[in-house]
Amino acid sequence: MADMKKTCLHQCHVDLGAQMSPFGGFDMPIQYRGIVEEHNAVRNACGVFDVSHMGEVDVKGPDAEKFVNYIFTNDVTGAPVGQCFYGMMLHPTGGVVDDLLVYKRGENHFFLVINAANIDKDVDWILSHRNGFNVEIDPLSDSLGELAIQGP
C-alpha cells in the first residue's frame, strides 16, 4: 500500500475508524459503521463523502466557454454562474475519453471534475486541445479537497 495516494482527509478517516481500501489509486474510506446504516443515512437524512481523489481542472480566459464547448459534449453557452453539467469528452472518432462534471464558476471561468483513475490522461488530453484558444488551464488536483453531500 506504499504506492497508494492519500487525500487531505486521510488521517481524519483513519482516526475516526474508517475501513480503508484502494480505489482509483488512493487509499479511500469505504465505510465506517456498516453499509446498511450508512445507506439508510443517505436515503433518509444526509451522507458526506470524501471525493478528494477526483481530479480538478480550472479553465479561465476569454475563450473559456468556447474551449469547454469544444472538448465537452454538452453546450455550456450562456449557462448561468453556478450551473453544473454532466457529460463526456470524446475522441474525434467518437470514442469516450472520460465522463466529467463541468461547473460554470464565473464569466469566462469553468471548473472541471474528472475521474481519479484518469487524472493524468485527462489533463494531458485537455492540454493537448488548447491550441488556438485563449485560455489558462490549471490542474488543481493536488491542491484541493472535495466533499460530496448526498441525501434526499
Name each model-derived stretch:
Residues 1-152:
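Basic, glycine/lysine-rich polyanion-binding surfaces/domains
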